[in-house]
């Protein structure tokens, strides 16, 4: 499989989000290689986006979001679930794409419909925060075969607090894919 190159991630966050659909997320945790096809994502557009973690500025937690593109931003929610994001755009912007759901491709038996579930199924945790997605054991790759599908655009999930950003159409998923997260 061909890893996505750094310039792929250095582009506009919405474009990167849409183009991540259909790509393979690969994690080799030392025991086995797990592969999932990305079927749902959400774009977070930096400091002006009130739903984005970086909207509160540069902190220890958000530092990775302001760094170079093509790194993983992994954080814990509700004290029990990890969420995996891909840092996008140029350094200093603070943008990322949340991976919301995967279609199991290889060595995944658990549910993957939601960011916490997919992280558990793929064995993604805080040790992978700030990991370069060009590494040999954790990366995103071009899929095998054709990638024809229709992209659906909807508001992001769980960001009602984000004022005018709450209804922004920044959630993207593959139409009719059975692995998208439940709302």
UniProtKB/Swiss-Prot annotation:
It holds the Pfam family Pur_DNA_glyco. Its EC number is 3.2.2.-. One of its GO terms (molecular function) is DNA binding. Keywords: DNA damage, DNA repair, Hydrolase. It comes from the Bacteria. The keyword DNA damage applies. GO terms for biological process: base-excision repair. Disulfide bonds: none annotated. Belongs to the DNA glycosylase MPG family. This is Putative 3-methyladenine DNA glycosylase.
